[in-house]
Amino acid sequence: ATIIHAFDDSHVIAGQGVIGLEIIEKLPNVDEIYVPIGGGGLVAGIITAVKEKNPNVKIIGVESSAYPAMKKSIENNTLETVSGNTTIADGISVKTPGKLTYEIVRQKIDKIVTVDDSDIINAMFLLMERSKAVVEPAGAVALAYILKHKPESGKTVVPILCGGNIDMYLLGQIVSKGLSGMGRMLK
């Protein structure tokens, strides 16, 4: 059997880079791309492909504030392990980034930011309500950041939305919290 690492593998990184190529092809004037970060495979692939085609595009990585492993690693200029906390974004709850992904991200990332669970819930609710799209919590962090920290007017920004692995009970809780937060549900 061949074991392929979920994020710290050059083939996985290259495959995920295709997303970046597609963005550049469809939106050649894109200014910023916001990418979820767990172990770093997705952002490493996208950043490699995009920066090769257009080094002026800003790549902003987004982590859960409960697991800021890549952010801490970049800030301290060494691979870091975080203890982590509870988060609904379990798909990116990675304690230590990959060695290969860390090196790529360290050299090319423009910025890494974090979001809280409440921001993620708001983004997921908005996606479901307005776009009828269900995205897992880990895949909604990029939009969560954009919604909370509005990009500069006139900028073309792309949030990467990915994954649909979500428990039905959690999905129900997110809808309930979203409706309650908007004053549209009595409890």
Locate each region found by the language model.
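PLP-dependent amino-acid enzyme catalytic core
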Residues: 1-187
